[in-house]
Amino acid sequence: GTKTHWRPDLEVFTDIKIENEYFEDVLKKQAVVNPNITFILRIQRENNSFEEKTFYYENGIADYVAEIAGEKPLTSVQFFTGDRKGRDREDKDDYKVKLSVAFTFSNQVKCLEYYHNSSFLEHGGSPEDAVKSAFTSQINAYLKSNNKYLKNEKPITFQDIEDCLVLVSSSFSTQTSYANQTKKAITNKFIKECMTEFLKHNLETVSYTHLRAHET
């Protein structure tokens, strides 16, 4: 493997005291989106001994969703993955996209996390828009087709759904458009469109027994 040693220049980095929790959070997120890879954090104490923590998710986001949901999720964890190719505009070149989504429902916890090219998207962007559109559309269609709505009842909204949804998505693309320089949201039109189609298709074909288990 590769070993990298780096010492910050104190003239540039005037404050180099970074809490251990920051490194733990970063490595955990990397383990989540890089399945079957072990990340080890070693923190040197004042007595020169080392405190060591290991981060590992054999099945990546699927195991992470199961961890968040705990022992009593309302449904089993669903995992979808696929590849797409397209472009954001007619005058642009095609690029490749790899999509992975894991989710379950819970009445104990809710969580929505989006990652792209191994980076956590704090503000979501295209993947978040796709999840909102696809889940609202498909669950609404299921409720209508099975006569689950009461007379004059308003259609379900994503706010209703997210209250019991535990979902993590991880996507990769050969071209990425970020909302701004902080890179906490992506704006690729094609990623939004293909991920919406990808989710709708998989939600439509997945066994509806999982959704029935969510009904109360």
Language model features by range: what are they?
Residues 1-7, 13:
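GHKL (Bergerat-fold) ATPase N-terminal catalytic module, capturing the glycine-rich phosphate-binding loop
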